[in-house]
């Protein structure tokens, strides 16, 4: 993998990859400041998202639902993540499958067992709605798709673990703050 990224003009972040290579690798492109994160079996940022069983689909990247999770599960979400999320919502309908759609059934299952993930997605959905208005994109379509997604999430029965954690609520932190490697699109 390292040779592939190097042939494409990316350089591995040696320190980060040495410390985190068992779960995540980071490659940076020096000219345009692009960053590629490679997650190994799971995405561990503010929440842990298991990906091992989600990688068998056709396509060069994660499914739209997993890409959406990669953005919305970040508690301290930045404008780049909000823009990316808006683009995903504009480009992909909500459905119960992964074929060029955001799999709402999958997201509902994940959030029905993890109150913290549910809460972070809930907060960030509001932030995406606000950002869509500022960005002057089709905020009605974004609202419609988020409403459809939350209809599925809210309809999914919640686990006992979810219900117990919900009683604690926001009084206790429900997320981890990952190490910030660098700001998106900024060279070192």
PLM regions and their residue ranges:
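Conserved catalytic core of two-metal-ion nucleotidyltransferases
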Residues: 2-46
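The feature captures the alpha-helical scaffold/lid subdomain characteristic of nucleotidyltransferase
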Residues: 34, 40, 44-60, 64-188
């Amino acid at each position: 993998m390292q040779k592939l990224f190097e042939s494409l003009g990316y350089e591995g972040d040696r320190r980060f990859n040495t410390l985190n290579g068992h779960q995540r690798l980071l490659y940076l492109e020096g000219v345009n400041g692009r960053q590629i994160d490679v997650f190994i079996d799971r995405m561990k940022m503010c929440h842990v998202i298991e990906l091992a069983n989600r990688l068998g689909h056709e396509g060069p990247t994660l499914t739209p639902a997993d890409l959406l999770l990669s953005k919305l599960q970040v508690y301290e979400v930045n404008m780049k993540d909000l823009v990316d999320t808006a683009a995903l919502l504009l480009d992909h309908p909500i459905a119960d499958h992964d074929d060029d759609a955001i799999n709402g059934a999958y997201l509902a299952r994940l959030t029905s067992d993890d109150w913290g993930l549910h809460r972070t997605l809930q907060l960030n959905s509001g932030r995406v709605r606000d950002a869509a208005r500022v960005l002057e994109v089709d905020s009605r379509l974004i609202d419609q798709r988020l409403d459809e997604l939350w209809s599925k999430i809210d309809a999914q029965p919640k686990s006992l673990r979810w219900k117990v954690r919900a009683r604690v609520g926001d009084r206790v932190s429900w997320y981890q703050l990952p190490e910030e490697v660098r700001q998106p699109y900024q060279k070192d």
